[in-house]
Amino acid sequence: EGYDTNLIGNGTDATVVEADEFDRSFLHLHPNIACLISDDADHLDIYGTNDAIKSSFAEFAAKISDKNTLFIAQGIENINGTEVSVNGTAVINAYNLRFENGKRVFDLDFKGEKITNIKLLMPGEHNVLNASLAFAMAKTYGLSNEEIKSGLDSFKGIRRRFSYKINTEKLVMIDDYAHH
């Protein structure tokens, strides 16, 4: 939110892409670091079967040679990577979820390292999972815990993904292009 563009560049050698499986276009990417949030039966009009979707995700995951740089939400089966969970048992696990001063706050067990008081402006346990996956990728890229926490704390979300249009005591209107 607030950038008025879908591409932000500052001359670094990193590019962050939200890849969509809709038309199999994500199979044209060759990432060094990636995450898989879900392999649900979606876009059956394109894939035909759930098995075809899962095969596509497996093909994408196979492009990442170092499985230490592939992060997957706990529960995704038959793909090797580092599991991430919320209140789960993964090696990277968000826990102690709470609200403080209108923000979602949580702690993260990152492979035995306890990282506390990670703050998000966005509600929802699914956003804690998204933030945990983003944290794992950013840390793997070399950012410090404090740099990542600062970035998450200031991230306003993506336009039309649970965007408040009206937020008063009497009326709340949310624009959410929820296609899943």
Question: Where are the regions a protein language model picked out?
Answer:
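Short acidic loop-to-helix transition motifs that present clustered carboxylates
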Residues: 1-3, 157
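Flexible active-site lid/hinge loop adjacent to a nucleotide/diphosphate
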Residues: 3-77, 121
